[in-house]
């Protein structure tokens, strides 16, 4: 079966109802296994290792792309937050912009890119300023503090 959905930064697949959905190709730049300080297992086990800024796929391959990158810039390399969510590079603006462009490149015309962001350290307005050529159609805030934003981009 050909995968129709690409998750560019799957991490431990936290928000999926089916963590092994046959329609989704789960990619991440890392594979990682650990037990967190509270005893929970952390498994970052992508189907394929891939850099979201340089995806190894042809143009217009997927119907949907999911992009949930690391959101933290100020986090200790060995902290549980870094282990679980990853860490943004220092040049995070270029990383986000390049990743969105790559996601849109592999997205089919008429497809949707879902971008999830958490504002704990960097506000969504700053993130959107870093993205050239694309803007979300709509977004929705979730969580108790309204710090997580889900945004939908469309490829026309």
Residue ranges of each PLM-predicted region?
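Class I S-adenosyl-L-methionine-dependent methyltransferase catalytic core
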Residues: 1-156
């Amino acid at each position: 079966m050909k995968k129709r959905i690409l998750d560019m930064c799957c991490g431990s697949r936290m928000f999926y109802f089916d963590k092994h959905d046959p329609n989704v190709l789960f990619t991440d730049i890392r594979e990682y296994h650990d037990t967190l300080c509270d005893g929970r297992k952390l498994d970052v086990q992508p189907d394929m290792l891939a850099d979201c800024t340089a995806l190894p796929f042809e143009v217009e391959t997927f119907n949907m792309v999911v992009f949930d990158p690391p959101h933290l810039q100020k986090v200790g390399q060995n902290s549980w937050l870094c282990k679980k969510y990853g860490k943004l590079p220092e040049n995070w603006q270029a990383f986000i912009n390049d990743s969105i462009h790559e996601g849109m490149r592999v997205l089919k015309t008429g497809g949707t890119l879902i971008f999830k962001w958490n504002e704990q350290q960097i506000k969504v307005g700053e993130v959107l300023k870093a993205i050239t050529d694309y803007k979300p159609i709509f977004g929705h805030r979730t969580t108790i503090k309204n710090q997580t934003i889900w945004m939908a981009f469309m490829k026309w």
